[in-house]
Amino acid sequence: MYHRNSAPPPPGWSGGYPPPQSQWPPHSYQYPPYPPQGPPPPPAHSYSPPPTYGNYPSPYSTPPPHSPSPYQHPQHGHSRSWTNPSLPPRPPRESQSFGKGAPSNYRFQYSECTGRRRALLIGINYIGQPNQLRGCINDVTNMSTFLHERFGYRREDMVILTDDQKNPMSVPTKINILRAMQWLVKDAQPNDSLFIHFSGHGGRTPDLDGDEEDGYDDVIYPVDYRVAGHIVDDEMHNIMVRPLQPGVRLTAIFDSCHSGTALDLPYVYSTQGILKEPNLAKEAAQDLFSALASYGKGDLSGVAMTAIGFLKKAAIGDSARQRTVMTKTSPADVVMFSGSKDTQTSADTFQDGEARGALSWAFIKSQKQRPNQSYLQLLNSIRAELEGKYTQKPQLSCSHPLDVNLLFVM
């Protein structure tokens, strides 16, 4: 997708490993000024900057009301889910130790997801622009209905940003997206359940703070990215993950290219439920092949440069992972399903008579067909829906070590 250069991302957070937060911290994020030469507003509207999130209208646009949700909050008289002991166990109420790789005595808290619910849904088709998409707005419509009917999210607690709306505050410009992200997490309390869904273009930009193993930050593109620039994963992490208290749940669905670590969550899990480590062995094999090719051509300097390059890459990759674990781990309960690995693109698909994003479609379908799955089961069922149709491989990542056999809740 796009790899447009824009203003450099914000400097990396150098505050070290964050302590668990007992109260809502002061937010240091400053709103960026809206570009003076932005895209023209929709007809019959004169754009004025949105108010601060304290007066944020919720929702920006409300879909037609549905019948009352059949969803009921689960009871917690036992550790198993609902009344069926064969279902995956619910998350434990006790605080959990981070274990290996984390500072001693540092703990996190799973969310029971029994408190307030809020959702931010962003769908951008980039109407009239190069590389226009077709299914992103449909994704938001379908996700809104699914959240309401399956998980009990109220329509009035959803903010929806799509680029087909006439209200300028409902258009997914960079400033609207950033302010909506702040609205999403404002005053969040333990056991609250927050949800963000982004369907649109994603890309990569050179990493400037050394926290990425591959040397690139993931970015998403607002509708006005040509003027306002992209939004970097470091920025999204600082706004939506860093302020959260222990026990607050944030579920993220990023259906975009190169979205594997779009929130900079340090714990990434395979379909076997194993915590992934950087694949330096594969890179070593690729670099060894290059070295042998140089040797065969008599290019000894090429052999030396390739060997030095691999050693440097391995050192940087290991250092980046340690930095991410030490600075991006959170005592909150943040879980993300992303449409593809950092190096992959995500696809539009055509399902049930309309264009959709592949991950958004698979996430909803797999849960409708089989409710009450574990995290690992859900990841594998999403992968199964896409297998053989697309090359992308959805990813599961978390802000803390995750017991992938627990019931997926949100």
UniProtKB/Swiss-Prot annotation:
GO biological process, one term: proteolysis
Chain spans, region Disordered: 1-106
Record keyword Plastid present: no
Pfam family, one: Peptidase_C14
InterPro entries assigned to the protein according to its UniProt record, in alphabetical order: Caspase-like_dom_sf (IPR029030), Metacaspase (IPR050452), Pept_C14_caspase (IPR011600)
Function: Involved in cell death (apoptosis).
Protein's UniProt name: Metacaspase-1B
Protein source organism: Aspergillus clavatus (strain ATCC 1007 / CBS 513.65 / DSM 816 / NCTC 3887 / NRRL 1 / QM 1276 / 107)
Taxonomic path: Eukaryota, Fungi, Dikarya, Ascomycota, Pezizomycotina
Name of the coding gene: casB
